Amino acid sequence: MTETVGKAAGGAATARELTFRGIALGGAITLLFTAANVYLGLKVGLTFATSIPAAVISMAILRVFRDSTIWENNIVQTVASAAGTLAAIIFVLPGLVMIGWWQGFPYWTTAAITGTGGILGVLFSVPLRRALVVDTPLPYPEGHAAAEVLRVGSGSREGAEESAKGLSVLVWNALASVGFAVLTQTRLVAGEAAVWFRTGAGATGISGGLSFALLGVGHLVGLSVGMAMFLGLAVGWWVLLPLLTAQAPQASDLAAWAGGIFSSQVRFFGAGVIGVAAVWTLLRIAGPVVGGVRSAIAASRARNAGHALALEERDLPISGVLLGSLAVLVPIAILLWSVIAGGPLAGSEAVLIAGAVVFVVVFGLLIAAVCGYMAGLIGASNSPVSGIGILSVVAASLMLVGLFGRDQDAGTTEALVAYALIVTGVVFGVATISNDNLQDLKTGQLVGATPWKQQVALVIGVVFGSLVIPPVLDLLNTAFGFAGAPGAGPNALPAPQAALISALAKGVLGGDLNWTMIGWGAAAGVCFIVLDEVLGRLGKLRLPPLGVGIGIYLPMSAILPVVIGSVIGHFYEAWADRRGDAEFARRMGVLTATGLIVGESLWGVAFAGIVAASGSDAPMALVGDGFATPALVGGTILFLALTAFLYRRTRKLVG
């Protein structure tokens, strides 16, 4: 696996890249990150990005080998991030337990749903690399951050002094981020706060999270996306929520009342905006995508004709991608047949399997492009893949309504709902891996990696993840169960996205889904598209409609720190542009943000293990709810002071 190459990033004559030890290390990291992501996703509906923590761990371990390289470390983070990202399948599969179709998670069926969708996600996004990674101005915030971590950790920058400064910034900011995150778990400082209040007959609220990771993400995504998300936040929380709560019966618990309406109505409005923005995104990138496919075909012909391509430009052969995609459809068809056989849908195998396979291919290709674009725009960890899951399950359910209608008995309807969830699970695997894949390939491009080797590593990561996820899911189901499932106990895991997606499938197939909010969201999405295009033509700051949709869809506590981070990043970059070495100053800014993300991400893994081992939601809490006000005041002051100190320190190091 070692070959002689001319690596652009380091100029090494011989580079170790796709090695057995790298794959083994990536697999070991996978066990930790995937299990942690599965638990956290079911508990709070969020997962964390694993690329940067995996890169940091890899560099720390492989540093003992004198022949380790930046490209080998890149392979490790690629394997680990693919498996960690695949854990987002928990946003769909627990729905099968919630509706009573499954009692647990059958190992091979769960692994097949997860693995086939993930591998298709890798293959479908191969021809997108040229269009969405090479020939694009998309920022890829996490891809850039991971590349900076690899560069600094490997010492590959020119000039020992610059490397030392960069590593210092990364480590200091990571330690500060970890320290603050630890304090929030003790509850001596608040990690999040929300205030709910009435607005006439309605209600709304203001909430914010004290998260250095989200602050760093805001710096990396930039002012345009940050302001688009702020517009979405304003529309969702300060326009829609007051209007909708004013029309609903009032309740004594203001937070539960308004929060419930946000989840059941405002989020659907946001999903409508995301859907229209996703379609518009697809139309805008259709030309580059077609060009990317043509480039891939041309590259394959050039290689067959004996013309050498630079290693940094070699993808998996397009012929292999096509054959591989067709080959993966075979186990998908077998999987679907096993679901149908002997049940209420028996006798309709041909039409159901054919319809589902066509749906997986067509819809999978569309969302692979859209999810790749989303990753480039705002980063994989902030992409609303659960919104894509909503659109997928609605589309899959409508396909089944078209084939069977709605006048079915209860047993057949339940079987159709389960079938829709399984098809959605495969498509969701395509979405999550496409979202992560292009982010990893951007990292590879920045460090001079070989694309086809990364694509192989991504497939390996998918296989690792698909083998780990089923037993973890089954263990958590046995120990806690899921809220809404038959026989669920008081400690059942909420699994909010799975609950929503399964409810949508039942609503569409049962004929009782309210399309009003999705329709209004779609109409608003068109308006946001027009606004963005007008701003672009006027040369003003653009407001990407997908960013607006995300701002509506996600909680304010997740959006506000990103918005603040984008403003801080804007002012920092304006300062950096006035320096003598603007590029170095900008890179130091990226490392500042990266350190903030790295620290909190690594702590997220550690704390997930503590929570799982202790069985307590707050195993490190030192004070109770009575300390909430001092914790909020003290936490806010400490957060602001640390932010100012860390950015000032970076500026002093830049000089």
Descriptions of predicted regions:
Residues 1-655:
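Alpha-helical multipass membrane-protein architecture
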